[in-house]
Amino acid sequence: GSFRRFERIAVAFCAGSLLLIPVYFLAHPHATQMARNFVIPQLPGGSGQLATVMLLVIGIVGTTVAPWQLFFQQSYVIDKRITPRFMKYEKADLCIGIVIVVVGGAALMGATAAAFAGTHGLGHFTDAAGLASGLQAYGGRMLGVLFAIALLDASIIGAFAVSLSTAYAVSDVFGINHSLHRGVRSAKGFYAVYAALIGAAAAIVLIPGSPLGLLTEGVQVLAGVLLPSASVFLLLLCNDREVLGPWVNGRKTNTFTAAVVAVLVTLSVILTASVLFPSISSRQILEIMIVCGAAGVLAAGYTLTRRLRGGGAAAAVDRAGQETWRMPPLALLQRPAMSVGRKIGMGALRLYLGVAMILVIVKIVQLALGH
């Protein structure tokens, strides 16, 4: 095993994502329209199609900020064997990756919108093959080939990251030796899980008539639905002083994370309403967003009031010793105390997860059956 070799190969494939930039310019999309819709988004489709649109929106969130990434990143950084003094470099690495993903996603959306606008293929392709064919028909063979190469590149990155994330998680849970620094003989279980996942994914792709586009969308929507729970789990962990010491979250980070979770839950509520009431209108969706926003403001006000009554601002975090901090061994950590409010919140989150996942599956089945 060689972590350095794996990372160099992965970075080379990540650079391949930049192929989407020439795809964008070859398609000649309307940049002004993209800029306007970025600031003032619109929901396409009539009232009966809004459920499908919301499914797509949550899927985009799920594929951009996938919950498995939260666990992959911490396992990968640990496997890299770097110390906290390199944290600034890791943050810079993360920011560069975010920029590449956002630029690539925007380029792909702009190119496909330009290629399919006003054509018979608009809304009638179901997978990446249909997308590539449409791009080639619109901009020539070079456009289609570049997209196909970028798609293959992204698929390999996904196979690397998702399978590795699961292998890390399974090995952590069962106490199996796991590291890319180890060879196959010293980490058989880790590499077995890794290889089995890649093999299973390849087998699904090779099944004749497999609805790959629908499967992809369904998986990403489930990722978007699972993201709030993963974010809450991460938020609780990031506020545990015994685990993170001087690295615990500050108030600004907690506020931002809570807002992100609130937005994701709001999207899931809208998806729930659109599945239960297929004829829901865009105005009713706006009303749901207003109600959820008001509920969030009330919750924030209640939390602030309770904190002020309890003795004012929270104790300042001592950031001294960040570069030398090490988490105590797991066996020495105390079980975290769960307040009544936290127990109620976790119970509500479990209920949300169960209902949202069932409704996502129902909607995916409806799409598969053509309803």
Language model segments and positions:
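Junctions where cytoplasmic loops transition into the N-terminal start of transmembrane alpha-helices
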Residues: 77, 83-106, 355
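Extracellular/periplasmic helix-exit of transmembrane alpha-helices
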Residues: 77-78, 99-130, 367
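A generic transmembrane alpha-helix motif of multi-pass inner-membrane proteins
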Residues: 50-55, 252-312, 350-357, 363
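C-terminal membrane-solvent junction of multi-pass transporters and transport-like membrane proteins
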Residues: 3, 9-12, 180-195, 217-272, ...
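Membrane-helix boundary/coupling elements in multi-pass transport proteins
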Residues: 105-108, 113, 144-176
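Helix-loop junctions at the membrane interface of multi-pass solute transporters
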Residues: 61-90, 114, 172, 236-237
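Loop-to-transmembrane helix boundary motifs in multi-pass membrane proteins
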Residues: 96, 100, 142, 146, ...
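Hydrophobic alpha-helical segments and their helix-loop junctions in multi-pass secondary transporters
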Residues: 1, 14-45, 54-74, 233-240, ...
